């Protein structure tokens, strides 16, 4: 290979100044952003703000009121337009990177590199912070870093006789150039596309890594992992991100805030901090599906000086969410390398649903390839990829096995690591494999917890968070939950706690042979119009829980 430096890594750069790209637009006046005012508690879903924080001016509010509400068909058409445009952007970035072979473009790691570069280039607040921090570091004699550039590790294909393998190359781009290219392609700021990518990364992290350290840091038991969806989502993902987050994730955010407030009693006197804290609690209340859970959140909202008692209340709330699940949205998020293939795949639709048939059909048509790290098994890696795309980290393994015709294994039994390849593992001549697990059946995705009834479960992870709306028993380790119920309920809100514990006990006392999602069936992948429903076969020999006894890397230990 040509252009190799000492370490065997190509280092390409794209040299163009921000001034040349923006051609004088950088001096445009920016709108004045007024501080947000705290809205009263509401169960109504808020409009998704942009990742760069939406304005709250009266003009913007009036504009929103006059907007005509989109019909489901219009929404599906705009979603289709978004995924196609994301694919076009990916193709442009790969041309810039000089990676034009189909195998290079099908590589999941190359798609993730482009996605991360895009997120870095569009995060103006982080860039501004990095520049200020670097300016301080330079004064202290540290190295100067150009934060106008961002880059990633791509993989270039190398053919050796009959063998195909991949070698890592590091490529940098100007942030302004990436932003301009993205906005031009999307025809707008493309905030929905950015949110879509962030959710995809979050779902991948949920599957590939455990979050035991993050749970323990806020005093939550690692067995509550099924409530911790979306724990790596950045705040700029807005209301779309909140919909994806599990109840435990929001509880952990609130507990961290209370911890800071206890250390600094002046924190909640700052109107911005107070607004942020109350917004977390309002989002948490909207997540709750039982009145007893909402009453407990109201108790915390009404606390003037949040402290230990509020942390105990929130801990109980997180435990109750194992039994009475909150509403967590699910969606199919595919790497943008798959979106880029839509024209070639003959995917002839003008509407696209991320929770219905179109996304699942596109997943089945795609031919994604992943780098194999040392010791990776290709079939096991395919299971990780499937679960990442469908956000199914906490779904019942028996349901996933029935939909794919493949016996799914718990995380501890998989011989594979995550999709991100750490720098120390990036070597010449890395192997790759096709992600082969496909859907034989499909079912619509759900945002409901499926709370009709409890089921039997195991150890480690003690509950499931349903993703597919199909009739089945909900897996739940009743023994583990009962251990959680033995706690002190005395204090200022004994009645509220008592009501919540009674609700949990009542739910636990239900028969274990009942089903959730009554009447919901699955369908052959060729049955787009749901003509011939099929009962889902639940194979008892497959473990319910993916994180039953976990041996995955912890997300906090990642070496990026």
UniProtKB/Swiss-Prot annotation:
It is found in: Virion; Host nucleus. Late in virus-infected cells, may be cleaved from a 56-kDa protein to a 53-kDa protein by a cellular caspase. This cleavage might be a marker for the onset of apoptosis in infected cells or have a specific function in virus host interaction. Pfam families: Flu_NP. GO terms for molecular function: RNA binding; structural molecule activity. Keywords: Capsid protein, Helical capsid protein, Host nucleus, Host-virus interaction, Ribonucleoprotein, RNA-binding, Viral nucleoprotein, Viral penetration into host nucleus, Virion, Virus entry into host cell. GO terms for cellular component: helical viral capsid; host cell; host cell nucleus; ribonucleoprotein complex; viral nucleocapsid. Residues 10-28 have a biased composition (Polar residues). Its main location: virion. The keyword RNA-binding applies. GO terms for biological process: symbiont entry into host cell; viral penetration into host nucleus. Residues 1-73 are annotated as: Disordered. Homomultimerizes to form the nucleocapsid. May bind host exportin-1/XPO1. Binds to viral genomic RNA. Protein-RNA contacts are mediated by a combination of electrostatic interactions between positively charged residues and the phosphate backbone and planar interactions between aromatic side chains and bases. Encapsidates the negative strand viral RNA, protecting it from nucleases. The encapsidated genomic RNA is termed the ribonucleoprotein (RNP) and serves as template for transcription and replication. The RNP needs to be localized in the host nucleus to start an infectious cycle, but is too large to diffuse through the nuclear pore complex. NP comprises at least 2 nuclear localization signals that are responsible for the active RNP import into the nucleus through cellular importin alpha/beta pathway. Belongs to the influenza viruses nucleoprotein family. This is Nucleoprotein. It comes from Influenza B virus (strain B/Ann Arbor/1/1966 [wild-type]). The gene is NP.
């Amino acid at each position: 290979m040509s252009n190799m430096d000492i370490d065997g890594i190509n280092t390409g750069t794209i040299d163009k100044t921000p001034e040349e790209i923006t051609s004088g637009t950088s001096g445009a006046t920016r709108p004045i952003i007024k501080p947000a005012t705290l809205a009263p508690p509401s169960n109504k879903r808020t409009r998704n703000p942009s990742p760069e924080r939406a304005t709250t001016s009266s003009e913007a509010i009036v504009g929103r009121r006059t907007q005509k509400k989109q019909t489901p068909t219009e929404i599906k058409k705009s979603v289709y337009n978004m995924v196609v445009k994301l694919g076009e952007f990916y193709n442009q970035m790969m041309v810039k990177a000089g990676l034009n072979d189909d195998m290079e473009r099908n590589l999941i790691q190359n798609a993730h590199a482009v996605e991360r570069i895009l997120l870095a280039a569009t995060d103006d607040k982080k860039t501004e912070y990095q520049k200020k921090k670097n300016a301080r570091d330079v004064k202290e004699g540290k190295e100067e870093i150009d934060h106008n550039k961002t880059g990633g590790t791509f993989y270039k294909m190398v053919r050796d006789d009959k063998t195909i393998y991949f070698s890592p190359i590091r490529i940098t781009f100007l942030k302004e150039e990436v932003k301009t290219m993205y906005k031009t392609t999307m025809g707008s700021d493309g905030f929905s596309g950015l949110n879509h990518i962030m959710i995809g990364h979050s779902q991948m992290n949920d599957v590939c890594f455990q979050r035991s350290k993050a749970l323990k840091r806020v005093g939550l038991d690692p067995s509550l992992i099924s409530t911790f969806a979306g724990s790596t989502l950045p705040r700029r993902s807005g209301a779309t991100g909140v919909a994806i987050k599990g109840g435990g994730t929001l509880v952990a955010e609130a507990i961290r805030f209370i911890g800071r407030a206890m250390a600094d009693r002046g924190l909640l006197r700052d109107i911005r901090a107070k607004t942020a804290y109350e917004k977390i609690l309002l989002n948490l209340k909207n997540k709750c599906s039982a009145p007893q859970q909402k009453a407990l959140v109201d108790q915390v909202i009404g606390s003037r000086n949040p402290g230990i008692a509020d942390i105990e209340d929130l801990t109980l709330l997180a435990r109750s969410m194992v039994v009475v699940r909150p509403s967590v949205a699910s969606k199919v998020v595919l790497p943008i390398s798959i979106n880029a293939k839509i024209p070639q795949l003959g995917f002839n639709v003008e509407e696209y649903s991320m929770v219905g048939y179109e996304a699942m059909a596109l997943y089945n048509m795609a031919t994604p390839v992943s780098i194999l790290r040392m010791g990776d098994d290709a079939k096991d890696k395919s299971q990780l990829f499937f679960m990442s795309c469908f956000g199914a980290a906490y779904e019942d393994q028996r349901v996933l096995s029935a939909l794919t015709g493949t016996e799914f294994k718990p995380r501890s039994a998989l011989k594979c690591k995550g999709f991100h390849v750490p720098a120390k593992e990036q070597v010449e001549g890395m192997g790759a494999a096709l992600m082969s697990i496909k859907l034989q059946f499909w079912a619509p995705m759900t945002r409901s917890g499926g709370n009709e009834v409890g089921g039997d479960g195991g150890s480690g992870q003690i509950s499931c968070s349903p993703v597919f709306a199909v009739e089945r028993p909900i897996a739940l380790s009743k023994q583990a939950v009962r251990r959680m119920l033995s706690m002190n309920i005395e204090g200022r809100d004994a009645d509220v706690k008592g009501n919540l514990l009674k609700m949990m006990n009542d739910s636990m006392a239900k028969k274990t042979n009942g089903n959730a999602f009554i009447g919901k069936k699955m369908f052959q992948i060729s049955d787009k119009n749901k003509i011939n429903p099929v009962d889902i076969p639940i194979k008892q020999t497959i473990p319910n829980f993916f994180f039953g006894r976990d041996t995955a890397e912890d997300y906090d230990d990642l070496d990026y």
